[in-house]
Amino acid sequence: MKMIDIVKNKTVLLLGLAKSGESAARLLDKLGAIVTVNDGKPFEENPTAQSLLEDGIRVICGSHPLELLDEDFALMVKNPGIRYDNPMVEKAIGKGIPVWTEVELAYLVSDVPIVGITGSNGKTTTTTMIAEVLNAGKKPAKLCGNIGYPASSVAQTATAEDTLVMELSSFQLMGTESFHPHIAVVTNLIASHIDYHGTFEDYVAAKWMIQRQMTAEDFVVINFNQKEAKELAGQTKATVVPFSTQEVVDGAYLADGKLYFKGEYIMDADQIGVPGSHNVENALATIVVAKLLGVDQQAIQESLSAFGGVKHRLQFVGEINGVSFYNDSKSTNILATQKALSGFDNSKVILIAGGLDRGNEFDELVPDLVGLKKMVILGQSAPRVQRAADKAEVETIEALDIADATRKAFAIAEKGDIVLLSPANASWDMYANFEVRGDVFLQTFEELK
């Protein structure tokens, strides 16, 4: 354990609760810090804050009073979703107070190796794939991070034999200083969260923080399909191991429908348990990590063949009267929907698309829409999606919401067809998040059975 003395008897302000905030608060308290928790949710509506107070941790709820920072705090640990232009964060930085996320705590309380996975798309699937392959290869792995299990909590339970497999967002990485994974994976890079970061360059810089403490004994796994990611290869002290579906590289690659690692045959691409070209990329990244950590070819092949996917990420839901349903609600941008469509015969696909209108047109998606059986469109962005469908010469049906869209798609589907929810848009015009949107799709499927 690297950090006990770093926080012991130090005053720490924890800004924002949620699941990871509670975990961080309890860990800091356990390590002897003098913790103050500040959360915007009113105390009477905040059972987490109530529980922390009962356990002797100071809690201030209902607002974020700037005068709180007049106290002499040695450290701020913030929820990753809280922006750096938040007045509390700005004041802390102005006073020279270090600002961390709980990922930094997770690193500092555990001595086990970390595999960190970041990128714009594919993080959760790749993180899950890696953990499953490592466990199948008798290399015990624990999932944590942005995937829903607080890293600071999981890190405390890790034993010497374990590897932490950690999904990392740009928001989390911005709050790190000494964080040092043994292997870092960059799945891909496209413009995302620009409202948070300001520019694409700043977004990439936040992602690239994953490797800043790495050395030549560590490994960065990079998607060489992408120019933006490939350009990072010369900007690290770590050893770069690439993967690609487009060229033979000194790492993992696709050639003639087969997956290889440095010339060693691993498996056929069509043996991967989930469809789509993006899942071939995810599998290649997984193969690199597995081989670096000593997993044999048979364990990799068997695990990737059995991989069933992740909820809301091109998840096979089931069949009704020979019609297959796939839930790709996590598809919140054009690239994700392009990747989803790549795994299917368009002539059999009824695509459900549309959602929050962010002002972007969908011209990039037009070539991928050509030949679709039909589209069901909805949400604020429906007029823009309609324009793309018109250019692709695909007929559309309008829907009120996801439940309505699912029913309308099924009504026109025939045996052998595919109903694919892959919205290419965020959910916030109708639903709290992509999980809620996907759950409505799943619930409607159950009602149609």
From Swiss-Prot:
Main location: cytoplasm
Reaction(s) catalysed (UniProt annotation): UDP-N-acetyl-alpha-D-muramoyl-L-alanine + D-glutamate + ATP = UDP-N-acetyl-alpha-D-muramoyl-L-alanyl-D-glutamate + ADP + phosphate + H(+)
GO CC term, one of those recorded: cytoplasm
Pathway as given in its UniProt record: Cell wall biogenesis; peptidoglycan biosynthesis
Pfam family, one: MurD-like_N
UniProt keyword annotation of Cytoplasm present: yes
GO biological process, one term: cell wall organization
Key word Ligase present: yes
EC number: 6.3.2.9
Positions with a binding annotation for ATP: 119-125
Keywords from the named record: ATP-binding, Cell cycle, Cell division, Cell shape, Cell wall biogenesis/degradation, Cytoplasm, Ligase, Nucleotide-binding, Peptidoglycan synthesis
Subcellular localization(s) per the UniProt record: Cytoplasm
Superkingdom per UniProt: Bacteria
Cross-referenced HAMAP family: MurD (MF_00639)
Family, similarity comment: Belongs to the MurCDEF family.
PANTHER family xrefs: UDP-N-ACETYLMURAMOYLALANINE--D-GLUTAMATE LIGASE
Record's function text: Cell wall formation. Catalyzes the addition of glutamate to the nucleotide precursor UDP-N-acetylmuramoyl-L-alanine (UMA).
Protein name, UniProt field: UDP-N-acetylmuramoylalanine--D-glutamate ligase
Species in which this protein is naturally found: Streptococcus suis (strain 05ZYH33)
